[in-house]
């Protein structure tokens, strides 16, 4: 598929395109990013230490799983340029679009995963522009005629910095939101 119609289930772009920078250990995530409620600040999170009982010999059973806390050694802010894990390519960007396809019955939303900064950055700009023009609305059709958004993929030349620090342009298929 190169182009198909989609509608989004909610008005928050952070909910229809959840994404994070994450560092994985052998068994689970060690560090991950979470956005502030306004979507402007990325916070670096980690798991809180598991508490022990009064004797100090047994861990306390945690209801609802381990608690997330801001990472202490960076003040809780996610700043990839100064992050040792990001610089060593241990921390990577992942995201997904959550949507419905008009005419296809489904109880749960479809997901389209991406690891492209370019796709997610352009989608955020589109979401913010459309939400501004529609009084904050992203969910549903764009107008009374049932006009949907479209997800496409386009072959684009994107730049990245190679291991020697030189800018290099390479072709890459990028998800695009229309």
What function would you assign to each model-found segment?
Residues 84-178:
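Extended serine/threonine-enriched, polar tracts that run as long, contiguous segments within proteins
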């Amino acid at each position: 598929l190169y182009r198909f119609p989609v509608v989004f289930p909610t008005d928050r772009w952070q909910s229809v395109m959840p994404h994070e920078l994450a560092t994985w250990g052998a068994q689970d995530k060690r560090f991950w990013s979470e956005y502030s409620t306004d979507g402007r600040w990325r916070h670096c999170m980690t798991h809180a230490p598991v508490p022990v009982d009064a004797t100090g010999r047994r861990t306390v059973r945690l209801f609802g799983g381990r608690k997330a806390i801001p990472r202490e050694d960076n003040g809780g802010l996610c700043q990839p340029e100064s992050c040792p894990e990001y610089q060593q390519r241990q921390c990577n960007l992942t995201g997904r679009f959550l949507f419905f396809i008009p005419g296809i019955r489904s109880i749960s939303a479809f997901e389209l995963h991406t690891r492209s900064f370019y796709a997610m950055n352009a989608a955020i700009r589109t979401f913010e522009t459309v939400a501004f023009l529609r009084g904050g609305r992203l969910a549903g059709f764009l107008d009374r005629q049932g006009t949907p958004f479209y997800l496409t993929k386009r072959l684009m030349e994107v730049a990245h910095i190679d291991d020697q620090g030189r800018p290099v342009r390479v072709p890459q298929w990028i998800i695009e939101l229309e």
